[in-house]
C-alpha cells in the first residue's frame, strides 16, 4: 500500500512529486505520458526565474528534478477509475500501455470491500491529469487526423516547411501556434471565429509583424477537404458565405477538455467537467485531491498548476498525519 499515488505527468504532478519526496512519503507517479501540455508548448517566457525557455526543455527539467530525488515515475499507465473503499483507502484500476511495467502485477481482489482488482492501493490520491485538445467536430477532421490535421504545433509544425497552413483558434495557444508556424511555413492563415482574440496582447502584436501571416476574423471553419492528405479547408464568414483556402496543414487550437473521467462519480464537477476543489485542493471526497488544469481553478497557467500541485501535496500530508 502506498501513502500516495500521483496521477499525471506535468507541472502539478511534478511539484507534488518533489514535495512528496522531501517528506519521505511512500509514493509513486503514474502517467500515460510524462510532460503533458507543457511538453507541447512553444516558447515559455513567464516561468519565474527563467527568462525564456520552451516546453520540451522545461518538461525535461521537470523530469530531471524528480530524478534527482529518486522519484519513481511509471509511464504508459492509463488509469480507468479511482474508487474509495470502505476502509478509507483508494483503489486505482488501470491498463498498461506501451512501456508500462505494471502488466501482470495485479493485486488480489479486496473481497470484503470491492469485487474488482486494484492495480494500485493508496491512502490518498492526487489527480493531476490535465486536459486534452477540444475537437472541431466537423467533416474531414477525423479523416485527416495525422494526415494534415494536428493538435500539436510543437510536435508537427516542423513537418510543414515552405507549406501553406492554417491555425484555428482565438486564444494564446492559437497565437503561439501561428507564431511558430510563421517561422516554418510559407504562409499561415489564422482562422478566428470571433471578432477579436482572447489571448495576450504581446502575442498578437508579435504575430502582426509577420509578413507571411493572414488573420481572418468572424470565420467559422465548416469542413476540411483533401484526398490522401489535407488540401484545403472551408469556412463561413459572418454572413454565412463559404470560402475555401488551399492549405496542406490544419492546426486546431480551440481549447481544452479536462481529463476528469477517472474520478468516482460522486466527485463534484462544474459544467465544463472540471473537478471542483476547495482552497486545500481537496475534492468533496476526503483524501482525494486534484491539481492543475483538470480543476476548476481559473487561469490555466503552468505556474498556477505547479502551485496547486504543491498545495495538494501539503494538504495530503496533513490528511495522512491525521489518519495515523
PLM feature spans:
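Residue-level detector of alpha-helix initiation sites
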Residues: 10-12, 131-133, 171-173, 296
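FAD-site-proximal beta/loop scaffold in flavoenzymes
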Residues: 137, 143-159, 252-304, 308-311, ...
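A Rossmann-like FAD-binding core segment of flavoenzymes
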Residues: 66-98, 119-122, 183-279, 318-324
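FAD-binding core/adjacent interface of flavoenzyme oxidoreductases
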Residues: 1-7, 35, 39, 73-163, ...
Amino acid at each position: 500500500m502506498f501513502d500516495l499515488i500521483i496521477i499525471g505527468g506535468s507541472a502539478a504532478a511534478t511539484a507534488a512529486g518533489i514535495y512528496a519526496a522531501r517528506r519521505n512519503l511512500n509514493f509513486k507517479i503514474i502517467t500515460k505520458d510524462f510532460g503533458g501540455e507543457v511538453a507541447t508548448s512553444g516558447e515559455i517566457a513567464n516561468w519565474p526565474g527563467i527568462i525564456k525557455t520552451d516546453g520540451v526543455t522545461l518538461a525535461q527539467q521537470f523530469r530531471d528534478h524528480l530524478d534527482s530525488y529518486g522519484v519513481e515515475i511509471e509511464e504508459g499507465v492509463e488509469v480507468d477509475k479511482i474508487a474509495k473503499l470502505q476502509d478509507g483507502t483508494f483503489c486505482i484500476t488501470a491498463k498498461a500501455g506501451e512501456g508500462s511495467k505494471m502488466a501482470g502485477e495485479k493485486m488480489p481482489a479486496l473481497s470484503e470491500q470491492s469485487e474488482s482488482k486494484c492495480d494500485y492501493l493508496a491512502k490518498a490520491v492526487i489527480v493531476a491529469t490535465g486536459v486534452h485538445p477540444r475537437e472541431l467536430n466537423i467533416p474531414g477532421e477525423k479523416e485527416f487526423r495525422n494526415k494534415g490535421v494536428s493538435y500539436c504545433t510543437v510536435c508537427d509544425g516542423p513537418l510543414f516547411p515552405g507549406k501553406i497552413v492554417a491555425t484555428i483558434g482565438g486564444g494564446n495557444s492559437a497565437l503561439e501556434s501561428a507564431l511558430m508556424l510563421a517561422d516554418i511555413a510559407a504562409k499561415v492563415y489564422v482562422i478566428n471565429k470571433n471578432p477579436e482574440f482572447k489571448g495576450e496582447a504581446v502575442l498578437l502584436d508579435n504575430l502582426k509583424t509577420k509578413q507571411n501571416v493572414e488573420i481572418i476574423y468572424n470565420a467559422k471553419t465548416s469542413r476540411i477537404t483533401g484526398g490522401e492528405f489535407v488540401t484545403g479547408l472551408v469556412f463561413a464568414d459572418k454572413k454565412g458565405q463559404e470560402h475555401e483556402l488551399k492549405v496542406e496543414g490544419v492546426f486546431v487550437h480551440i481549447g481544452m477538455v479536462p481529463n476528469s473521467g477517472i474520478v468516482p462519480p460522486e466527485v463534484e464537477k462544474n459544467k465544463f467537467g472540471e473537478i471542483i476543489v476547495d482552497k486545500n485542493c481537496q475534492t468533496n471526497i476526503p483524501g482525494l485531491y486534484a491539481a492543475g488544469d483538470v480543476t476548476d481553478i481559473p487561469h490555466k497557467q503552468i505556474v498556477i498548476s505547479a502551485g496547486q500541485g504543491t498545495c495538494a501535496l501539503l494538504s495530503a500530508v496533513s490528511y495522512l498525519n491525521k489518519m495515523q
